[in-house]
C-alpha cells in the first residue's frame, strides 16, 4: 500500500544553497522532516544551476520520509537574467526598465515548457511575454 501523505511544502530556494536556516528549517521542521537530509539532497541535485532560484515541492509522508520535485526557475527570474536587471519596474505601464529579444523569450519558453500548461512553444512564449510586460520589460523582434 502507498504511504499516506501528511503535508505538501512548496518553497523557492536558491540552487545549491539550501540550509537549515529560515525559510527551509521552520517549514520542514513543522513537518518533522530530516532537514539536513533534504538540504544535502537538494544542493546535490541543483548544484549545476547555481545562481537560479529553484521552486521545489516537498511531499512529506506519515513515517516522516519525504520526496521532492524540483521545477524550472520562475519566468521572472529567467527574464531578469536575460535582461541583465536586478528587479522589474515599479510602474510597468509607465517605466520600461529593459528589453529582451524575441529569440531570448523563445529560449525561456522552451526552458519553462515542462512546467507550463501550454500546448506548444508559441503559447508558452505568449505566457513569458505577459510576464515580461508586467515587469516593465519590452520585447524586441
Swiss-Prot record:
GO CC terms, sorted: cytosolic large ribosomal subunit
A GO molecular-function descriptor: structural constituent of ribosome
The keyword rRNA-binding is assigned to this record: yes
Post-translational modification summary for this protein: One or more lysine residues are methylated.
UniProt xrefs under Pfam families: Ribosomal_L11 (PF00298), Ribosomal_L11_N (PF03946)
InterPro entries on file: Ribosomal_uL11, Ribosomal_uL11_bac-typ, Ribosomal_uL11_C, Ribosomal_uL11_C_sf, Ribosomal_uL11_CS, Ribosomal_uL11_N, Ribosomal_uL11_N_sf
SUPFAM superfamilies, sorted: Ribosomal L11/L12e N-terminal domain, Ribosomal protein L11, C-terminal domain
Keywords from the named record: Methylation, Ribonucleoprotein, Ribosomal protein, RNA-binding, rRNA-binding
GO BP field: translation
Top-level taxon of the source organism: Bacteria
Role, per record: Forms part of the ribosomal stalk which helps the ribosome interact with GTP-bound translation factors.
Record-linked PANTHER family: 60S RIBOSOMAL PROTEIN L12, LARGE RIBOSOMAL SUBUNIT PROTEIN UL11M
Subunit structure: Part of the ribosomal stalk of the 50S ribosomal subunit. Interacts with L10 and the large rRNA to form the base of the stalk. L10 forms an elongated spine to which L12 dimers bind in a sequential fashion forming a multimeric L10(L12)X complex.
Family recorded in the similarity comment: Belongs to the universal ribosomal protein uL11 family.
Name of the protein described by the UniProt record: Large ribosomal subunit protein uL11
Native organism: Oceanobacillus iheyensis (strain DSM 14371 / CIP 107618 / JCM 11309 / KCTC 3954 / HTE831)
Amino acid at each position: 500500500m502507498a504511504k499516506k501523505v501528511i503535508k505538501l511544502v512548496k518553497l523557492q530556494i536558491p540552487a545549491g544553497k539550501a540550509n537549515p536556516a529560515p525559510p527551509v528549517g521552520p517549514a520542514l521542521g513543522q513537518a518533522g522532516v530530516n532537514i539536513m537530509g533534504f538540504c544535502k539532497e537538494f544542493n546535490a541535485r541543483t548544484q549545476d544551476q547555481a545562481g537560479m532560484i529553484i521552486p521545489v515541492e516537498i511531499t512529506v509522508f506519515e513515517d516522516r520520509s519525504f520526496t521532492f520535485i524540483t521545477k524550472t526557475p520562475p519566468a521572472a527570474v529567467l527574464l531578469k537574467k536575460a535582461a541583465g536587471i536586478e528587479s522589474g519596474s515599479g510602474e510597468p505601464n509607465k517605466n520600461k526598465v529593459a528589453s529582451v529579444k524575441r529569440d531570448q523569450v523563445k529560449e525561456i519558453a522552451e526552458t519553462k515548457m515542462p512546467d507550463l500548461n501550454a500546448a506548444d512553444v508559441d503559447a508558452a512564449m505568449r505566457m513569458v511575454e505577459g510576464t515580461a510586460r508586467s515587469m516593465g520589460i519590452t520585447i524586441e523582434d
